[in-house]
A protein has these predicted regions:
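Generic structural signal for small/hydrophobic residues in well-ordered secondary structure
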Residues: 4, 78, 166, 178, ...
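Glycan-recognition and processing domains
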Residues: 246-303, 316-317, 367-399
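Noncatalytic modules at the cell exterior or secretory-pathway interfaces
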Residues: 48-49, 352-364
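N-terminal pre-catalytic "stem/leader" segment of glycosyltransferase-like enzymes
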Residues: 1-32, 294-295
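Short, surface-exposed beta-strand/strand-loop-strand elements in extracellular ectodomains
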Residues: 319-332
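PAPS-dependent sulfotransferase catalytic domain
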Residues: 22, 28-75, 81-190
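Extracellular carbohydrate recognition and processing domains
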Residues: 28-29, 333-356
Length: 399
């Protein structure tokens, strides 16, 4: 899978010898080999790092079969922003490179330069629709209008086979997470490569005209991006925990049978995706947000069956509860919610079949976030979901 941008794959290449990755003078050889998938896969297998190529998931799957130790990273981008970027890319191709383009790409470049943006989108819908879903679903860009539901199902299933999922909009944090996980030196630069000249950029008016059609063309990509966001947030939360553990002498302790670990938002927080602590008429709490996913790491090593009780002081919108998901150790678990005085109490039972050796990971996810300004016109624009007061974990027994 293309790793999402020149800056990012240059960062990856900095961690390998020059001949361990694809050299710029090797592209003609690789393009010839593409006609023979087996020979192409074998040639790529000789490399330590594969970047620059636009590969769909079928190529990735072949590499994974040849080398189970292969690690795959991809960056997803907000679909409409990606389309804006691609149109600007085609507009900026230098004249000196025109002779090297095939007929399809030459037409794209000439049309991007000469046609109104909305006419260009209308003509080249196939190239601008659900590209990331096609890549992850193993479907060529040349396939016109693949059925959306099977495409999205395949893309999301294959996304689970990607080791590291990052976001173009969070490229520096993605690089930090990957450096920590892979033992790389983080050489990610703030320098922007392949910058589009102002006269080749889409104007604000052009973007407004084509935003709606592009959103409609990329409904699968929008859903795929949302799934990718959750993978990225999980990776970022674990990276922050790793940084904390490396710098701290604190070690989680076993949770004996029948004992209860009680965590209050009065205590120091180890987690990600939470607003600052707030004091209220009842007790301190933290709002989950601003993203749709919030993670809390608890300092215990439970095993077997657990009972979890979460005290929720407030919910920004009733719509949050209809989509709220709870995961324990990255496994979705069912839960019940009941009213207790001024609070909502969420209760769940989770089974951890393997003895845990580290922190207990609790994740709260929702379909959307809201602000007090959105809901009631209050001058508070922070995106929030639920306000958590306490979390209790009881060790019930071993599996």
């Amino acid at each position: 899978l293309k790793t999402g941008g020149t800056s990012f794959y240059r960062f990856l290449e900095n961690n390998y010898p020059r001949d361990a990755s694809i050299r710029d003078d090797a592209f003609s050889e690789l393009h010839r080999l593409k006609e023979d998938p087996t020979a192409f896969a074998q040639r790529l297998h000789q490399l330590q790092l594969i970047t620059k190529l636009h590969l769909d998931f079928s190529s990735v799957a072949r590499q994974q079969e040849m080398d189970p130790s292969l690690r795959v990273v991809t960056l997803l981008r907000r679909p409409v922003a990606r389309c804006f970027s691609m149109i600007e890319h085609w507009r900026r191709v230098p004249e000196v490179h025109m002779a090297t383009l095939d007929d399809v790409r030459r037409e794209l470049v000439l049309d991007a330069r000469s046609m109104p943006a909305d006419a260009f989108v209308e003509k080249h819908q196939q190239r601008l629709s659900d590209h990331q879903s096609k890549m992850l679903g193993g479907v060529s860009d040349h396939v016109a209008n693949p059925p959306r539901e099977p495409l999205l199902t395949a893309a999301k299933a294959n996304l689970t086979s990607i080791d590291y999922v990052g976001l173009t909009e969070q490229m520096h944090e993605t690089a930090s997470c990957l450096s920590s996980a892979m033992g790389f030196f983080n050489s990610m630069s703030s320098e922007r490569l392949n910058v589009t000249r102002d006269d080749r950029r889409l104007t604000t008016a052009e973007k407004e005209r084509i935003h709606g059609p592009l959103s409609e063309l990329n409904r699968c990509d929008a859903s795929l991006y949302a799934a990718g966001e959750e993978r990225f947030w999980q990776m970022r939360a674990r990276w922050k925990l790793h940084q904390f553990v490396a710098a701290s002498s604190h070690q989680p302790t076993p949770l004996p049978h029948g004992d209860v670990l009680r965590f209050s938002m009065d205590q120091p927080l180890v987690g990600d995706g939470w607003h600052e602590r707030e004091g209220g008429p009842l007790q301190s709490c933290r709002w989950a947000g601003p993203e749709r996913q919030s993670t809390l790491f608890l300092s215990c090593c439970p095993q077997g069956q657990l009972e979890i009780r979460v005290s929720i002081l407030s919910v920004i919108s009733d719509a949050v509860l209809t989509s709220l998901r709870l995961s324990v150790a990255a496994r979705p678990v069912p839960y019940e919610i009941h009213q207790q005085g001024e609070r909502l109490i969420l209760t769940a039972t989770a089974d951890l079949p393997e003895a845990a050796t580290g922190w207990l990971e609790l994740t709260f996810s929702t379909a959307n976030t809201y602000s007090a300004y959105d809901i009631a016109g209050i001058d508070d624009h922070r995106q929030k979901t639920i306000a958590v007061e306490t979390v209790e974990v009881r060790q019930l027994g071993s599996c």
